[in-house]
């Protein structure tokens, strides 16, 4: 079996908004990496035993006292080191060079001219017409290195940055003032590949097939012949977790699928068909619509609704767990970003490790061990593994759906009538997006039920019925979003279908709010 952790890169985080991108690019190349706060100890680095180290960018200035710096051991470990932006500046300072605040800050696109072809820049050139090789890169810095440390040479320049990259080939230390991890840097992935493969000598063993093989072996080793329970929602993370566990322990996995009446149209049946019939998983389906609706009666405050939905789910999950006498383990779909918690960089910890539980607040007496086979994976890696395990692409690439489901898409009090109307209207919206080729062009699309009535005309009669709002957004990271400019003809078709086919809805509106100031979900 391939050891997927045999070669690994350690990324020390100085607080850059792009740091997770570095990790995702390294994984994309096929090499395992981990993301740690910059102030780790020598002991921790030795225990991790990295094949190479990357120092990330960050918002601080190396010219300030008490600015973050790499542990001294980084430069004594005998492994290649790549400093990116702030990482290059702290490398220069710590090894005897000099940095200064720049009169001209560089933000955005820049063309760097390569001066010396070292291993990092081997075979890279974005401008074949120029006399010197050039790279189109993305800059984002105020400070710059003004004096090289001993043993270093300048490898790239820009008109405003005379040391845009540097290297000490003997010690295998490299620094770049730009960000190779962002897609705006055209040859960024090739540069990182040069570092990881050619300089560090890492093999590409981090592949979906190898990850699956490793996860299955670890699950078998950890749980043996014990019984495991998993809350299956039909979402990407719990679905992939279920298939990995099923492959490892078969019928010893007990999936609890709680149908809370707040799911999309026919979703409960689809989950049972997919995981029960197609994959042969052992699934306990709990039809709990009445229990959830009863608990939500009269509640219209969004946070209160979320808490009730969470509590009722845990109560039901707990009831089912008690019925299974031999269960020793709880499986969860925790993924790597859940494990990394962002904190203010001023604390000196840009990212700290937190204990994260998807099923929050499980009773203490459920003394179960935890199995988290996706704990090392980013979301895109989870999707690739799901595809390799046989899950359909349409399911893996579905738009995000909130944990409380329609509980936060029906504004105000939740009633069965409202949920049914919303389910049917939303199904039409999504169907038309698929048919028109717009579903994958937008990042998220859904329908919201508004607890207001509006006058409409049907035939010769007037009707006084409910209003729904359509919402479709485009975003890269879900932190900010633009409303999607869907064609008027498409919006008209969707509106006509909903009003004609869903009895009880008289008006359809389209939400044209961006984030900020609005959030993506209404509640």
UniProtKB/Swiss-Prot annotation:
Pfam families: GATase, GMP_synt_C, NAD_synthase. One of its GO terms (cellular component) is cytosol. Pathway: Purine metabolism; GMP biosynthesis; GMP from XMP (L-Gln route): step 1/1. Residues 206-398 form the GMPS ATP-PPase domain. The active site is at 85 (nucleophile), 179, 181. Catalyzes the synthesis of GMP from XMP. NCBIfam families: guaA_Cterm (TIGR00884), guaA_Nterm (TIGR00888), PRK00074.1 (NF000848). This is GMP synthase [glutamine-hydrolyzing]. It comes from Haemophilus ducreyi (strain 35000HP / ATCC 700724).
